[in-house]
Amino acid sequence: NHNDNVIYFKCKDEHDLCRKFLDDWIANCPDVITGWNTKFFDIPYLINRITRVMGEDEASKLSPWNNLYKRETMIQGRKEIVHQITGVAALDYIELYKWYAPGGKSQESYRLDAIAQVELGIGKIAYDEYDSLTQLYQENYQKFIDYNIKDVELIVKLEDKLKLLELALTLAYDTKTNYEDVFAQTRMWDSLIYNHLIERKIVVPPKEKNRKDSAFEGAYVKDPQVGLHNWVASFDLNSLYPHLIIQYNISPETLVQREDYNDVMTVLAPQANVEVLLKKELDTSGMDGVTLTPNGQFFRTTKQGFLPEMMEIMYKDRKKFKKLMLQAEQEYENEKDEEKKKEISKLVARYNNLQLAKKVSLNSAYGAMGSQYFRFYDLRIALAVTMAGQLSIRWIENKLNAYLNKLLKTEKDYVIASDTDSIYLNLGPLVSSTIKTQKEILEVISFMDKICETKIQPYIDKSYSELAEYVHAYDQKMIMKREALANKGIWTAKKRYILNVYNNEGVQYSEPHMKVMGLEMIKSSTPSAVRDKMRELIKLMMTGTQEDIQEFIFTFKHEFRNLPVEDISFPRGVNGLKQYSDSATLYKKGTPIHVKGALLYNNYLREKNLTTKYPLIQEGEKLKFAWLKMPNPIKDTVISFPNRLPKEFDIQEYIDYDTQFEKSFIEPIKVILDCLGWETEKSGNTLESFFG
C-alpha cells in the first residue's frame, strides 16, 4: 500500500501480532476509539483474542487503569456482551450515525458499505470473486489488507462529511459528561442541571425511585386535507418544547402544589383543558403571580425557574450558530467553484453540528422530563408541556383560518395540515385572487414571501401575544417563522406529504428541492431500486401530465424485469425466528412473510449443506425478501436472504417480478396518484398483458 498514513508491521505469529499491537496501543493510548460496529465486534474480538493468546493480565493493559469489565445487554432479542475498557471511551460510529445523522433512523441497511454509498457515493472494496473473507485472506493477502484499510478510510470520510464525533465531543463538553453519555439524555440533563444549580450554590435533591403509571397525552396532529394543493407556505414554531418551558416558567420549584392553591386557582384547575382555553371560556383575570397550563397546573411567575433559565441560554447559543449555518448554505448555493464549494460544505457541517448540539440538548430536556429515571421526573410537568403544545398549534390554526376567511370573504379551512409544531397553509386562493395574469413560478414565490413577511407573520406574532396574555404567561415565547414556500404540495395522510420547495427559511433555491415525509421512497423498507425511481416519478408529478407518468411507469416495468433480485427485494429486520419456527411444518400459521422467508432460507442452506459457506440468518439481523412463483425448489411463495441470494439455490427464474413490482412500486405510487385522480396506466395496458 502506497498510503503515507499506513504503517505495516510484519509479525511472525499471532502472539507477536498481539504484542506489537499492545505496545503501540500503550505508547499511543487513545481517549476515544471508533469504527463501524466496534461495540459488538472489534472491541470484544480484540479483548477475547488478546486474552486467549496472552492472558487476562496482558489484555487488561488496553486500559490505562488496567481494568476491563463486561456486561450483558439485549439487542434485537439477542443477548450480547459489551466490553468496557476503563479510561478509553468507545463511540461506535454506527450508533452515532443512528442517533445523530440527519437520515440516521431511516436507512435500508446499516452495513458500512450501504451507508458509505448513501453518504459518500463510494463503497467498500468488493471481493465477490471469493466466497468469504477467510478465502480472500488466504488467496489474495494484498487485497485483504487493502479491504481493511479502505474500511478505516470510509469512517474518516464519513466523519469529514458528517462531523458526528465532533458533535459527540461538543455535547459531552457542553454537558460535562463522559463521552459515552451522549447516548443517555437523562444523564446529560442530570449533569447540566447539577452544574447549573451548584454554580448558584443550590444543593441538588437526592434521586428518588419513580414509577410511571401510564403514558401521557402526546402532540396534536390534524387530519390533513388529502390531495394536491397549489402555493403552500409552511410555518414552524421554533424549538417548541423548550420555548413552552420558558413561556409557562415550567420548572420543579415553580410548580404550585394543590395545598397552596388560592380560591381562584381551586375554581380554575378542574375546568382547564385545551378546548376551553381555545374558546377563552375561562375567566383568568383573577390569577396573580401564576400562569395556567391546559392540564390544570399552575406555575409561579414571580421568579424564573432554573429549567427555563437554562433553556434560554441554550436557545440563544443555538440561534447564533444556526444563523451562521444558513449564511454558509446561501454562500454554497451562490458559489460556482467546486473546490470552494467543498470548503463551504465543511463549514456548513461544522455550524450545523454546533447548532445541533444545542438543539439536541434543548429537545432532550423534554425527553428526560418524561423519563421515570430522571431526578426531576413529574408527570404533571411532562403533561403541562405537551398540552401547552397542543394549545399553541391549534390556537394559531384557528386564528389563521379566521384571518384568511375575513380577507377572502370565505368560510374555508386554509390550514391543509398541522402537527406538533408546524402548520401548512393553502395560499392558492389568495394568490389567484391577487395575481390575475400568468406569472413565472419564482415571481409567485416572491409574492408569497412578501405576504408572509409583511402580513401573516405580524398577525401570528399578535395572536400569540394574545394567548400569552390570556394564560398570564411568564413571557411570550411562541416564535413561529415561515419555513417552506412551495408551488405544489400533495398530502395522502397524516404526516405523509410531498412539497416542491423553492424557498426554505429565506434560502432561495435555483432548482426546487423535494421535501418528502412519510412516503415509501424515504422508508427503509422500500427496495433501493424502487426508492430512486419513486423520487424521479414524484419529481415528474410536479411538472408533468398523467400521460408522462404512465409512460414513466411503463418504461420502468421493462427495467425492473431485468434488475438483480437484491435490488428489488424488500429490506426488513427479522425478529421472532424461535417464536414462529415449528419442527413439523417449519413455520407456524400467521408467521410474518419475511420471517417465513428466513426460516425457509436457513432450512434450504442446511438441505444443500451450505452452512459452512453462508451463515444462517440470526435473530435481529437485517435481511431482504422476495416473492416466488410456484412451483419452485423451495416449495413456497417467498425467500429471504442476508445480502445476496446464494447462486447455489438456483431459483432466479422463480422470482415473482410481477408481484414485486405491484407491491413495491405500483401500490405506494397509486396512493399518491389517487389523490390527483390519475391512473397508473392507460386502459387496456394491464400488468397481465405486459408480462404475458
Language-model features: locations:
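Active-site palm subdomain of RNA-directed nucleic acid polymerases
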Residues: 124, 393-420
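C-terminal, non-catalytic extensions of nucleic-acid polymerases
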Residues: 449, 453-692
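Common nucleic-acid-contacting/processivity interface regions adjacent to the catalytic cores
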Residues: 133-259, 339-399, 417, 426-428, ...
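Catalytic nucleotidyl-transfer cores of nucleotide-processing enzymes
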Residues: 80, 210-375, 491-522
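Catalytic palm subdomain of template-directed nucleic-acid polymerases
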Residues: 423-453
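Alpha-helical interaction scaffolds
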Residues: 1-18, 24-26
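Proline-aspartate-enriched helix->loop->beta-strand connector
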Residues: 21-45
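Active-site-proximal helix-loop-helix substrate-binding element of RNase H-like nuclease domains
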Residues: 4-8, 12, 43, 52, ...
